[in-house]
Amino acid sequence: MKEGRETEPAIQALAAVLMSQDVQDWIAANYNGVVMPMGAEELTIPEIAEPVTLKVGASPSPHAEILEYAAPILAEHNVTLEIVEFDDYVMPNTAVEDGSLDANYFQHQPYLDDFNAEQGTHIVSVVTPHYEPMGIYPGKTADLSVFSK
């Protein structure tokens, strides 16, 4: 989400639900190691008296699927989740920056840091619900030390 919105109750509710044991267990059960949960972190879901809608951009899989699972849980706390799927990695960030999305869910921290630096945007991460493992496969390089950070 855009910097400065981290403490909004609906954003905190979204973060808490994504990090809940329920969602973390669902990730583990549904992605068979292709997507790995980060581990439950019991964040408090704030009281939200008036219904609110959060518009969140996400890649179709696994991010939008995880949000679809989280949506009914959020609804129990007066938060309606509107999920907007994107098939590129630029529009979700520009939409958060211009305010047409409240948040997005699709990227890792190094990508976000580079995007902010290159585009002059002000997007921050609140939680990391999962990671997607990557493999290194043999090819022409015999020693991994040739790769820099």
State where each predicted segment sits.
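Ligand-binding "clamshell"
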Residues: 1, 114-126, 141
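Short, well-ordered beta-strand elements
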Residues: 49-61, 79-85
